[in-house]
């Protein structure tokens, strides 16, 4: 009887610890991501027309979809393997950020989010990607 009780207590404790650590992953990602004022004020020089969205989508599929998912929900095939939670880019919290903030975060990266300034060296292409990220909310 005592063995069963001890086994049950250990299993409940393990389950509690697992849930606690799963929640910690979400907490880790909640850190603020400061964006320099220069970028916050930066305007997107690329019009969000069909050509820009097509180019942005192509870049999205190549570089972003595996983590952020097809629709930007943070549910890509690699998302679960990351240390931090991938944000849902369609939420008002994210979409209220400026285009310049999107540009900065895409270019510079942090933690699990890689920098794309070498993989996507043309600024116009990053702006096309920003336009596509904006379209995910529609």
Feature names for model-found ranges:
Residues 53-61, 80, 96-100, 110, ...:
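Sequence context surrounding c-type heme c attachment/ligation sites in exported
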Residues 1-4:
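Positively charged n-region of N-terminal signal peptides that target proteins for export
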Residues 20-27:
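Signal peptide cleavage region of secreted peptide precursors
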Residues 31-34, 51, 61-84, 112-115, ...:
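Periplasmic/extracellular electron-transfer cofactor-ligation site
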Residues 85-100, 116-126:
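Electron-transfer interface patches adjacent to heme c in soluble/periplasmic c-type cytochromes
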Residues 10-19:
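Bacterial N-terminal signal peptides
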Residues 29-59:
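Electrostatic cytochrome c docking/interface patches
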Residues 105-111, 118-138:
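C-terminal capping alpha-helices of c-type cytochrome domains
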């Amino acid at each position: 009887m005592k063995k069963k009780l001890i086994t049950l207590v250990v299993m409940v404790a393990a389950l509690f610890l697992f849930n606690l650590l799963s929640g910690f992953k979400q907490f880790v990602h909640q850190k603020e991501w400061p964006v320099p004022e220069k970028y916050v004020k930066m305007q997107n020089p690329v019009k969000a027309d069909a050509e820009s969205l097509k180019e942005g989508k192509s870049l999205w599929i190549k570089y972003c979809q595996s983590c952020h998912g097809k629709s930007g929900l943070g549910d890509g095939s690699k998302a679960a393997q990351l240390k931090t939670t991938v944000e849902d880019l369609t939420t008002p919290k994210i979409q209220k950020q400026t285009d310049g903030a999107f540009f900065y975060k895409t270019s510079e990266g942090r933690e699990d989010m890689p920098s794309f300034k070498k993989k996507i060296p043309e600024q116009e292409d990053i702006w096309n990607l920003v336009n596509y990220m904006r379209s995910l909310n529609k």
